[in-house]
Curated annotation (Swiss-Prot):
GO molecular function, one term: tRNA(Ile)-lysidine synthase activity
Residues that hold ATP according to the record: S30, G31, G32, P33, D34, S35
SMART domains, alphabetized: TilS_C (SM00977)
Organism: Bacillus cereus (strain ATCC 14579 / DSM 31 / CCUG 7414 / JCM 2152 / NBRC 15305 / NCIMB 9373 / NCTC 2599 / NRRL B-3711)
Protein name: tRNA(Ile)-lysidine synthase
CDD domains in alphabetical order: TilS_N
């Protein structure tokens, strides 16, 4: 065991490949003992590692004059040390109210946005923060007590991608006690945030009542928690890659704000991959800003939702995310306003894009397309009256079906195809100038349609349809 604080941090930094030589580092300094210990450690290594150091401080304006005095303290210290200091005052309470989030999440968003800006300004490779071994223990315990994702249970990462570089935490290998001793040896007078002692916060209660007992059992227990954290992160990285690969085979449709998946294909995955697959979808749709009110309880409810025997149903998630099951498909999408009836003329040849993003392209040709799939409609040009009209469905709509006698209700076509009710109102119907329905894209062609086998040399009207939804890969 190393005797000195600096040697212990050196070993930890080397073991986890935390810091490269000849780098610019933005150091988050609150003025408290943790961040001061981090700053002075980096200053001690500055010449040896050829480091450029920039200090960044955020006044969240939670504590009025007291927090402003913290800012002035950091500014004065940096002036004495001759290092660059970037500070900002942010009314986090106002930001919190504006975006409807809790104070801690709001403060974190504001703080990280500022750190990213300073990192970019100085072309820094790293942002360094002062989290230590006790913080790691508290974080893991708190997430185990409250519930979290597998990634969350792994605790605080030593090093992770951030902006164009990395966010690093070199002090995770040392305890709070060791940090305080280091500050005392350097005769530092750190600022103390009184909120760190308020027992209304779970973390503070764990710090006061739980950690002392754990340290009695094993004074080096923070090292065990850190080892657990690293192993969990390594396992999680592998499982995430596997889940990503599997989910891209399960997803049937994808757009910016919606994802649909095949329930049977999803349920064929192992439970660990199902949980991570759901997390991938949520990260994609929420754009990695998952509401703090969303927890593992929601994931459990969703998995149970998939197992239900009822063919339809829905769940509401935080942030207006709605999950709708329809037969063997489940869609994740943000709540939308009721779709208004629509109707647009389509010239031949011509192109239109509907308000929902669906696109129709028409052409006239003596040859029919080689790819006659469900997105293409072909009819003899002279059999159709023009202009065409693209509209939403109407009560009582019927059409003649290619290869069948009589007519069939559009409603029945939707039901047979298991089209979810909420999608039927925006599903386009193609009519000719007389109002006769000639095509329901992706579902049924009318008796006017020409198949590839029937085609002879003639003048044809061809419609190509492209839905706003696409099958595709989810982003990591």
């Amino acid at each position: 065991m190393k005797d000195t604080f600096v040697e212990k941090v050196d070993d930890f930094v080397k073991q986890h490949d935390v810091l490269k030589n000849d780098s610019t580092i933005v150091v988050g300094v609150s003025g408290g003992p943790d961040s001061l210990a981090l700053l002075y450690y980096l200053l001690e290594k500055r010449a040896e590692k050829q480091l450029e150091i920039v200090v960044a401080h955020v006044d969240h304006m939670f504590r009025g004059d007291e927090s402003y005095e913290d800012l002035q303290f950091v500014q004065g210290l940096c002036e004495e040390l001759g290092i660059i200091c970037e500070t900002i005052r942010i009314n986090v309470s106002q930001y919190q109210q504006q975006y409807g989030m809790n104070a801690q999440v709001a403060a974190r968003e504001c703080r990280y946005a500022f750190l990213e800006r300073i990192m970019k300004k100085y072309d820094a490779r790293y942002v360094a923060l002062g989290h230590h071994g006790d913080d790691q223990v508290e974080t893991i315990l708190m997430r185990l007590v409250r519930g979290s994702t597998p990634k969350g249970y792994a605790g605080i990462a030593v090093k992770r991608p951030f902006h164009n570089g990395y966010l690093i935490r070199p002090l995770l290998g040392v305890t709070k006690e060791e940090i305080v001793d280091y500050c005392n040896k350097l005769n530092l007078m750190p600022r103390i945030d009184p909120s760190n002692k308020k027992e209304v916060y779970t973390r503070n209660r764990l710090r006061k009542y739980v950690l002392p007992h754990l340290k009695e059992e094993n004074p080096q227990m923070h090292e065990k928690f850190q080892k657990f954290s690293v192993q969990m992160q390594e396992d999680e990285a592998y499982l995430q890659e596997l889940a990503f690969e599997k989910m891209n085979k399960v997803i049937t449709k994808k757009s910016d704000k919606q994802i649909s998946l095949s329930i049977p294909a999803f349920e064929s995955m192992s439970m660990p991959l199902q949980r991570r697959g759901i997390q991938l979808i949520l990260n994609y749709l929420y754009e990695y800003k998952i509401p703090s009110s969303l927890s593992s309880i929601h994931i459990d409810k969703l998995i149970e939702f998939f197992k239900r025997t009822q063919p339809s149903g829905s769940l509401d998630f935080p942030g207006d995310l709605k999950i709708v099951r329809s037969y063997e498909e489940c869609s994740f999408r943000f709540k939308q306003e009721i779709v208004s009836p629509f109707s647009q003329d389509l010239l031949v040849p011509g192109t239109i894009t509907l308000l929902n993003g669906d696109k129709f392209v028409t052409e006239v040709s003596e040859d029919i397309p080689s790819n006659m799939n469900e997105t293409v409609f072909v009819a003899k040009y002279n059999d159709i009256s023009y202009p065409l009209r693209i509209r939403s469905r109407e009560n009582g709509d019927r059409m003649s079906i290619q290869g069948m006698n009589g007519t069939k209700k559009i409603k029945a076509i939707f039901i047979e195809a298991k089209v979810p009710k909420e999608k039927r109102e925006e599903w386009p119907v193609v009519c000719d100038a007389s109002g006769t329905i000639i095509w329901v894209p992706l579902l049924k062609r009318s008796a006017f349609a020409i198949s590839k086998e029937m085609a002879k040399k003639d003048k044809y009207m061809i419609i190509h349809y492209k839905s706003k939804e696409s099958s595709g890969r989810i982003m990591k």
